[in-house]
């Protein structure tokens, strides 16, 4: 019910795989099924995978395609805009609505009008700031970039966490609810289960912002962390009869935009990416529902919501078979949102860390929400300590 893949987009991920000696266990997606889909006029449409494909496709209107090339003449932003305002300014509204909004809905499940471009798409923001143009900046940086590559394991990403557990299991304490974090002189005191106390000089904290805000000794930080909102995500796994799917779904998945009026944010075609996860005559897919766009939908009766989702999927992929498997899970507080006040929040966290030596806050609400982001942050802090 968590991440479906991890992206190798930094050296820390490579180093972790090497340290755990699991390089031979890594599975990469089926190269023949690397397409991504959007919806246009109720039908699946492939996202172009090259500049040539993009020019020939009808994914954007001709005027929207022409508008993109004017990006190189637009002055860089003076301050941090929302994702919506940034892309509307540099590439045009249609580019945002058709390509950017569905993508970020799939990652953050949030509202692009309330997301900070500086923190949500940090690399794009930095390229614009450094080169004055996103297009020109990426052309100049292209040769230096690591080509991102996603991966998984035979039994899912639990293989990764299990390997980490095996390596450090003697140092882990399970079933331990932290009820307070205090500071006594130059030491930090952690109270567990309202009873057991631990004292340490160095502390790394990765718990969610809403949880840390309730137990931290610093009132200002507590109030700051409460400003971070989390959106709910309903995850639904479905098993289908492969031969009854009439439309081509040989790809990674499909993302939706608000105007599609679907009952889900996106679908991942799990068994098309990693064939081993389902029998050869079956298909496994993961449906994502909720986020800031569909919070009201999650208040619908669960059975009615399921029926609506299945109806939408049947129509989209032209499926007349049975639903042979169903498993679902609701994350009430699924994904932290990097809002327009995130600059202030990050600065307050840094101020706290500066005042409290060797206290490191490293949740996924700081400098990236992905697994690879968290691995990179952990690597950086481990070297500091």
Task: Give the location of each predicted region.
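Short, well-ordered alpha-helix to beta-strand connector turns
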Residues: 168, 200-201, 356
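Local beta-strand N-terminus motif with an aromatic residue
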Residues: 3, 24, 200-201, 323
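Dinucleotide-binding Rossmann-like beta1-alpha1 core, especially the glycine-rich loop
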Residues: 1-75
């Amino acid at each position: 019910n968590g991440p479906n893949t991890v992206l190798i987009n930094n050296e820390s991920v490579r180093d972790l795989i090497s340290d755990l000696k699991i390089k031979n266990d890594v599975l990469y997606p089926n190269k023949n099924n690397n397409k991504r889909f959007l919806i246009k006029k109720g039908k699946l449409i492939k996202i172009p995978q090259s500049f040539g494909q993009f020019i020939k496709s009808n994914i954007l209107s001709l005027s929207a395609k022409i508008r993109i090339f004017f990006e190189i003449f637009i002055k860089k932003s003076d301050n941090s805009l929302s994702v919506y305002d940034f892309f509307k300014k540099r590439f045009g509204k249609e580019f945002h609505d058709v390509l950017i909004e569905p993508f970020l809905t799939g990652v953050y499940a949030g509202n692009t009008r309330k997301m900070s471009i500086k923190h949500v798409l940090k690399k794009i923001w930095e390229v614009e700031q450094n080169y004055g143009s996103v297009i020109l900046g990426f052309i100049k940086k292209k040769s230096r970039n690591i080509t991102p590559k996603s991966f998984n394991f035979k039994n899912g990403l639990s293989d990764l966490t299990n390997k980490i557990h095996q390596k450090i299991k003697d140092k882990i304490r399970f079933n331990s609810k932290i009820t307070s974090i205090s500071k006594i002189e130059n030491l930090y005191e952690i109270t567990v289960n309202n009873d057991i106390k631990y004292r340490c000089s160095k502390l790394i904290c990765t718990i969610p912002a809403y949880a840390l805000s309730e137990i931290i000794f610093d009132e200002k930080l507590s109030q700051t962390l409460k400003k971070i909102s989390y959106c709910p995500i309903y995850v639904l796994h479905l098993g289908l009869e492969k031969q009854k799917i009439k439309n081509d779904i040989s790809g990674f998945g499909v993302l939706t935009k608000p105007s599609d009026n679907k009952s889900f944010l996106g679908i991942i075609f799990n068994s098309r990416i990693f064939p081993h996860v389902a029998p050869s005559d079956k298909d496994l897919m993961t449906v994502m529902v909720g986020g800031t766009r569909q919070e009201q939908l999650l208040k619908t009766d669960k059975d009615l919501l399921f029926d609506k989702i299945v109806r939408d999927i049947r129509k989209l992929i032209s499926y007349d078979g049975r639903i042979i498997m169903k498993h679902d899970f609701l994350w009430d507080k699924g994904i932290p949102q990097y809002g327009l006040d995130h600059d202030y929040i990050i600065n307050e966290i840094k101020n706290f860390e500066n005042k409290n030596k060797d206290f490191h806050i490293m949740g996924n609400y700081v400098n990236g929400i992905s697994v690879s982001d968290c691995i990179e942050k952990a690597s950086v802090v481990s070297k500091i300590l």
